[in-house]
Amino acid sequence: MTLHNNSTTSPLFPNISSSWIHSPSDAGLPPGTVTHFGSYNVSRAAGNFSSPDGTTDDPLGGHTVWQVVFIAFLTGILALVTIIGNILVIVSFKVNKQLKTVNNYFLLSLACADLIIGVISMNLFTTYIIMNRWALGNLACDLWLAIDYVASNASVMNLLVISFDRYFSITRPLTYRAKRTTKRAGVMIGLAWVISFVLWAPAILFWQYFVGKRTVPPGECFIQFLSEPTITFGTAIAAFYMPVTIMTILYWRIYKETEKRTKELAGLQASGTEAETENFVHPTGSSRSCSSYELQQQSMKRSNRRKYGRCHFWFTTKSWKPSSEQMDQDHSSSDSWNNNDAAASLENSASSDEEDIGSETRAIYSIVLKLPGHSTILNSTKLPSSDNLQVPEEELGMVDLERKADKLQAQKSVDDGGSFPKSFSKLPIQLESAVDTAKTSDVNSSVGKSTATLPLSFKEATLAKRFALKTRSQITKRKRMSLVKEKKAAQTLSAILLAFIITWTPYNIMVLVNTFCDSCIPKTFWNLGYWLCYINSTVNPVCYALCNKTFRTTFKMLLLCQCDKKKRRKQQYQQRQSVIFHKRAPEQAL
């Protein structure tokens, strides 16, 4: 085939016009070394350039030796960094179990796509740039384009999947996270790759058979069906602009929702701090109050007295019915705590129970103290509604098992003068006073016959109060940790999206410009823009390391060959955790 012009095509879009061969003055070579289109006919049938007198073209494609060295060195370094970085991501996912989360499964898929680009696409495109022609044949050309487009589109699809996953995790934490499993993540990743393959591979590989001929000239490599500017424009919109728009909107929604949750958590922490500083002992008809520290001091001053009064301590199940029905429902299983502020009715009236029924919060416990000359009530710290309070299922399952044991142990403790049981009873516990039993018999009748009797000191009452505050702090801590994880995931997503937009936008802008002006953009800009798209695969592992400490430490461990040391540290850590667990187990049973 003979050409008499100086137009060529980009490997991505065939309608790009630019200089295929440099002139001698541009290349800095002596005249006659490089073939010029204006004076020579170029035969590309065998992949060689020849002039009428039989001289062959420069094998460097019109570049100087130093230009070739610079291009090969720069692109080779980028390809090597891309390969090493994404291999580190894959190996890190394999060796570190902490990285095997649903979020990181999507990053693993993205790393696989980037690795393909680093191994195949970057090197073949560098060869194309240096030689200024495609010398590997039509089959290799079609395979390169198919792999390149499938991997690039899979990267975009994976970014979309990550964005939707983050969005639903933030906006629908209860419904979506229950369905968010590794199996479902694998299905979504598989769909991303299948869709990318179906969209591009058959059309690139078999288009010449669909239309009956191959229109790509020898020595060139581009997608045959992208020969029209309108088709090129449409593919750019579908492959880049639409996904970027969707991802930007989703990330904005994620950012707003995260900010909203941050404010809610700050309010919850503030209310928890206020609850800790509140006075929780209120004498009837008096403004006197005392803190847990004061209770301890009183307990120390009365060390010669074993029993200070009457204390009611119980955990009950979910109930919004009057107090008479609450006692019946105390023996049923449930998944939440009860609003048992109605214990105040033991000292006041039944009307207070009805007022507490409609309250928005629920208490863990209520303690009623009867001291000589005083009538005091210890009200527990309020917790959020039971719909928002998560109680471990194993604790709920212990209710029926411990019910009989609690009764027997409580009765034995009274007879033998034993200490408080190791675990708080799930039943109402009524504590008899050694000071004034007769005066408090009316309270006993209001609690019911199912209660047991045990001595309880002020110190134990203080521990009960601390238990309630600790429970609240644990809830806040879990919410805070969850929010921190969501923020880290959002930061990783933002870094990946930002890198994607920065590296892909220049090339796709040139695509739009080329639709209206096919000779306005030099070939050098096209090559730089296309290579910039590849650099996105180089930057992604850096984003993982910068935004995720676990990735960063695992990368460091692998690069420094500290795998054995890591295993030893892990074993030592597990041993320490085991010791800590065995030490805390008896304390948690109290």
From Swiss-Prot:
Residues 92-104, 165-184, 253-491, 547-590 are cytoplasmic. GO terms for biological process: acetylcholine receptor signaling pathway; adenylate cyclase-inhibiting G protein-coupled acetylcholine receptor signaling pathway; calcium-mediated signaling; chemical synaptic transmission; G protein-coupled acetylcholine receptor signaling pathway; G protein-coupled receptor signaling pathway; G protein-coupled receptor signaling pathway, coupled to cyclic nucleotide second messenger; ligand-gated ion channel signaling pathway. Keywords: Cell membrane, Disulfide bond, Endoplasmic reticulum, G-protein coupled receptor, Glycoprotein, Membrane, Phosphoprotein, Postsynaptic cell membrane, Receptor, Synapse, Transducer, Transmembrane, Transmembrane helix. Residues 323-357 are annotated as: Disordered. Residues 334-345 have a biased composition (Low complexity). It comes from the Eukaryota. This is Muscarinic acetylcholine receptor M3. The lineage of its organism: Eukaryota, Metazoa, Chordata, Craniata, Vertebrata.
